[in-house]
Design a protein with these regions (language model features):
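Intrinsic low-complexity, intrinsically disordered or marginally ordered coil/linker segments
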Residues: 1-96
Length: 96
């Protein structure tokens, strides 16, 4: 069983391989999931990318706690969808 992590990072896909033979950033379209879920994952990741303050990286983050909580809630929903679509083929981790 493959192990992946759902975790946004600036300028990266939101899926990370956690196995020795599948380690690193993974394009959601390369996974056996629906196109619509892959698109949702990328939209979610783009929301995170928009929080980056290039000039002052230490000041990066969401505008307020409400937007951050909404983002986390969306991540939890995507985590559940990802687990459902991948079934027993993958172990999915989401550090909420």
């Amino acid at each position: 069983m493959k192990k992946i992590k759902l975790m946004p990072d600036y300028g990266c896909f939101p899926i990370w391989g956690m196995d020795d033979d599948n380690f690193g950033n993974i394009d959601p379209y390369s996974l056996p999931i629906s196109k619509s879920l892959a698109e949702e994952l990328l939209v979610w990741s783009n929301k995170y990318d928009k929080t980056l303050n290039i000039e002052e990286p230490l000041n990066s983050g969401f505008e307020n706690i409400e937007k951050e909580n909404i983002f986390k809630y969306e991540g939890e929903k995507l985590f559940k969808k990802l687990k459902l679509e991948l079934g027993d083929q993958y172990t999915v981790i989401y550090p909420s």
